[in-house]
């Protein structure tokens, strides 16, 4: 029976020769992930199960990243709860401040996700690891609890949409523009409980950072997961970051897809998602005159070293607009250190931007950049729902690091070509 890439991974982890869409299966897990918001709830449910230990001390990862460094007493209590649980259960992959980072940048960096894995995380953007040719998806805290106790999870096998990427990207266009373009095409429910499977010669043109960004936002189209084929770039990344063995799965040529969508990368311009939904996209030349108050460059979507290099290229030798608060979040300590070694932090600081420790921060309206009533932000984050970054009457425009950096300089949503 012909299967998609996702179906092959799920079949293997279910101990089955084949699976078909709609089938309910029990799957063995390679990693169970949680953060400082979702894990306390999972701990409560885990304790109800009555298990004295997690299924595997090295296959559970907990990353306090949303409200860390602790923003208030309540968040400090949550992190204390998580910290004590990790110590009590001898969880090896607990990442304290100083080692932590934004979880979906940190997990691949630490080699905890490799090709062919099945990963669940109590965070919707767990789908990021599909960039490595893994099946990864977000779940609720109760599913995380069950996963920690049993090492297994139930899934309904998803159907798939095939995205064939062709051509090469134009200057200043990145993975963020690709996924915003796709979400603008199909809508936020356009891939509902489907696997978004990316293929085509254009995949080879994309950096791993681009692939992480695209897979990260598959959930914004309603997808169960997003996944890329494994190529030389993938293998190089995995070998650089992990000593684990891995398995490469390929979709069968005659696998069934709900539909196939062709994407010409050369025709995608810098793209911006307007409030208050990621599907509300416009190309940069359709934006018009929109003044802004804040720029956020970072998050699990666009806080990697490649993203910071692009932002620095735009900001080098320039000053951010005096009316724009510009906040930059390296996604992990390692990325922060690399940015320092490359002189990127100096460029940011000299431009008038501020550089934060790794944290999700303002992305979810947590801290470190909350918007007031009537304020607008350009952000490299993944969601722009009403009140997402602060006041319900604030606005968030989603864009790439290049567009965000250019907008910081001009004080309005701008193409990098206007600045560089």
UniProtKB/Swiss-Prot annotation:
Pathway: Amino-acid biosynthesis; L-leucine biosynthesis; L-leucine from 3-methyl-2-oxobutanoate: step 2/4. Keywords: 4Fe-4S, Amino-acid biosynthesis, Branched-chain amino acid biosynthesis, Iron, Iron-sulfur, Leucine biosynthesis, Lyase, Metal-binding. GO terms for biological process: L-leucine biosynthetic process. Its EC number is 4.2.1.33. It is an enzyme of class 4 (lyase). The keyword Iron-sulfur applies. It catalyses: (2R,3S)-3-isopropylmalate = (2S)-2-isopropylmalate. Its cofactor is [4Fe-4S] cluster. One of its GO terms (molecular function) is 4 iron, 4 sulfur cluster binding. [4Fe-4S] cluster binds at residues 300, 360, 363. InterPro entries: Acnase/IPM_dHydase_lsu_aba_1/3 (IPR015931), Acoase/IPM_deHydtase_lsu_aba (IPR001030), Aconitase_4Fe-4S_BS (IPR018136), Aconitase_4Fe-4S_dom (IPR036008), HAcnase/IPMdehydase_lsu_prok (IPR011826), Homoacnase/IPMdehydase_lsu (IPR006251), IPM_dehydratase_rel_enz (IPR050067), IPMI_cat (IPR033941). NCBIfam families: hacA_fam, IPMI_arch, LEU2, PRK00402.1. Belongs to the aconitase/IPM isomerase family. LeuC type 2 subfamily. Heterodimer of LeuC and LeuD. HAMAP family: LeuC_type2. Catalyzes the isomerization between 2-isopropylmalate and 3-isopropylmalate, via the formation of 2-isopropylmaleate. This is 3-isopropylmalate dehydratase large subunit. It comes from Clostridium kluyveri (strain ATCC 8527 / DSM 555 / NBRC 12016 / NCIMB 10680 / K1).
């Amino acid at each position: 029976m012909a299967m998609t890439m996702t179906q092959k991974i799920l079949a293997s982890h279910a101990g089955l020769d084949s699976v078909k869409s709609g089938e309910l299966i029990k799957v063995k897990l390679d990693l169970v992930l949680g953060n400082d918001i979702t894990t306390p709830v999972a701990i409560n449910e885990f304790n109800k199960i009555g298990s004295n230990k997690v299924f595997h001390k090295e296959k559970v990862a907990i990353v306090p990243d949303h409200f860390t460094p602790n923003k208030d007493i309540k968040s400090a209590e949550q992190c204390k709860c998580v910290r004590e649980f990790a110590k009590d259960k001898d969880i090896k992959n607990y990442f304290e401040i100083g080692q932590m980072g934004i979880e979906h940048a940190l997990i691949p960096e630490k080699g905890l996700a490799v090709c062919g894995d099945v990963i669940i995380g109590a965070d919707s953007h767990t789908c990021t690891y599909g960039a490595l040719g893994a099946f990864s998806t977000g779940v609720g805290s109760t599913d995380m609890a069950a996963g920690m106790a049993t090492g297994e999870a139930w899934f309904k096998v998803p159907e798939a949409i095939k995205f064939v990427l062709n051509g090469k990207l134009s200057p200043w266009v990145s993975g963020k523009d690709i996924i915003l373009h796709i979400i603008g095409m199909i809508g936020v429910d356009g891939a509902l409980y489907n696997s978004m499977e990316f293929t085509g010669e254009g995949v080879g043109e994309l950096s791993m950072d681009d692939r992480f960004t695209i897979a990260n936002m598959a959930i914004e189209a309603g997808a169960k997961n997003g996944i890329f084929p494994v190529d030389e770039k993938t293998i190089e990344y995995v070998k650089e970051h992990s000593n684990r063995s891995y398995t490469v799965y390929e979709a069968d040529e005659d696998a069934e897809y709900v539909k196939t969508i062709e994407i010409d990368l050369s025709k995608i311009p810098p793209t911006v998602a307007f409030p208050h939904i990621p599907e509300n996209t416009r190309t940069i030349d359709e934006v018009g005159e929109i003044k802004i108050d804040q720029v956020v460059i970072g998050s699990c979507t666009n806080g990697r070293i490649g993203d910071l290099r692009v932002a620095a290229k735009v900001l080098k030798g320039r000053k951010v607009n005096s009316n724009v608060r510009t906040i930059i979040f390296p996604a992990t300590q390692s990325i922060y250190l690399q940015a320092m070694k490359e002189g990127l932090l100096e460029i940011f600081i000299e431009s008038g931007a501020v550089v934060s420790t790794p944290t999700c921060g303002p992305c979810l309206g947590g801290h470190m950049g909350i918007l007031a009533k009537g304020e607008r932000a350009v952000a490299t984050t993944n969601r722009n729902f009403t009140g997402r970054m602060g006041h319900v009457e604030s606005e968030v425009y989603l864009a790439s690091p290049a567009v965000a950096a250019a907008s910081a300089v001009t004080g309005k949503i701008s193409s990098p070509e206007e600045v560089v």
